Amino acid sequence: MCFKTLIIAVRVLPYLLVLMAPANLALSDITTSNMTFAEAVQAVKDKNYRHAVNLFELQANAAQHDAQYNLALLLKSGKGRPRNYQQALYWAWSAYLGGIEPAKNLSKDIMSLLPDDALKLTRKKIEETLLDRIDIGDKSALMELALFYEELLEEPNFEEAYLWYSIASAFLLEGAIIARDEVEVSVEMKLIVELQNRASEIFDTLSTIK
């Protein structure tokens, strides 16, 4: 597999970037830093795929979506770690929900390689991960969860998508209001009041999380 596609998700890195992180760099910094990401990209160029997988995975678990995309590519190819289509799909879907557009086609390619039960389990894991992120106050996961319900289920769940877009709108997340209004036309009128009340309750709860 050609890894030129990895460059699609490379971040805009600071000037005079140092590839190796300082020894005292905190783990929280390592999981989100451009230095770690750049080191992983360099590892791919050097064909040190195992090191690249380890670094991308570290950042993928911290919801760094470009790292998730690159990790999905590596897991799909089986370089640096045994090929695993289900894990690759999990990270490709995660990357797409986080705004990495090339992950959409990658996800479609991987889906064709998996049975229905594996797709179901992967969807469940995505949903649980997003809900866990929301529970600890990660508001960026609100839009991702709404998009998950709108696009990644076997059949769209417009009601749940509307619920979470509504909450994201109240927090003024980018694109949430437009997405909410677009989805609303697909929701039965008799359900709107109930969904809006649920959204208000969840919003109040999330507002208490610092």
Model-predicted segments: where are they?
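Bacterial N-terminal signal peptides
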Residues: 11-21
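Short helix-capping/linker turns of helical repeat alpha-solenoids
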Residues: 31, 47-48, 61-65, 77-79, ...
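Terminal, low-structured helical/coil segments at or just beyond the last alpha-helical repeat
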Residues: 121, 132-133, 175-210
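Hydrophobic face of amphipathic alpha-helices that form TPR/SEL1-like repeat modules
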Residues: 36-43, 55, 70-77, 106-114, ...
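Structural signature of tandem alpha-helical TPR/SEL1-like repeats
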Residues: 47-51, 82-91, 118-128, 156-160
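TPR/TPR-like (Sel1-like) alpha-helical repeat modules
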Residues: 83-101, 108, 158-175, 181, ...
